[in-house]
Amino acid sequence: MATLLEKTRKITAILQDGVTDLQQELPYNSMTERLANVIDCNACVINTKGELLGYSLPYNTNNDRVDQFFYDRKLPDEYVRAAVRIYDTMANVPVDRPLAIFPEESLGDFPKGVTTLAPIYGSGMRLGTFIMWREDGEFTDDDLVLVELATTVIGVQLSNLKLEQMEENIRKDTMATMAVNTLSYSEMKAVKAIIEELDGEEGHVIASVIADKIGITRSVIVNALRKLESAGVIESRSLGMKGTYLKVLNTGLFDKLAGRNF
């Protein structure tokens, strides 16, 4: 059996390994899986909205209803509101308490089940909650030492995620601004008309129809789309006689156009 020191080293190694993949829908799955393995429990990481950032379920304690929460990547609002009101680690919550993550329909199946919740902080802000549970066997003091270390590691990782998201938002905003600024008045008018034809962020348009509708030439539309595509703001694909398929890659385009008067 691994010693406390060995387990501690495994957790601190997570910081060095950079196990997050921000392109994944659950960017902290790998990290959560490693933490659950070291602490020997089921575990999940949620942000302050209750959205799942990662989870690992080596032990089957869920029913279909609770499985759906993990499938939807979102825990119930009532549970999340209670969880974010915890400011220090709450250990070994009995299975019949509101903060226990076990399905209430299955309490009889896990009479010795316990849940431990630990707040995650980073840069002085509450970033989420680390939730762990076992069907049998309380979390010991050694386990809780690992939990405290784990939340520190997660806090650093989440802080990095927020920083990267901020940098990405700034980059997208800058690219959208630069792309719109390259457009002439007629081209901006054309792009606005095209956006109105889309179903949300994508759809297909017929340039000649839009050109006739707003009184411009088809070449103006073609030039506008070429500029936006070269800036990485949209992508397009010819559909032949059906027109052109468009997808907005940078949704900042909507705000930039909305701020212009035509």
UniProtKB/Swiss-Prot annotation:
DNA-binding span(s): 207-226
Source superkingdom: Bacteria
Annotated GO CC locations: cytoplasm
Annotated localization: Cytoplasm
Region (GAF domain): 1-159
Free-text function comment from the UniProt entry: DNA-binding global transcriptional regulator which is involved in the adaptive response to starvation and acts by directly or indirectly controlling the expression of numerous genes in response to nutrient availability. During rapid exponential growth, CodY is highly active and represses genes whose products allow adaptation to nutrient depletion.
Protein name: Global transcriptional regulator CodY
Source organism per UniProt: Lactococcus lactis subsp. lactis (strain IL1403) (Streptococcus lactis)
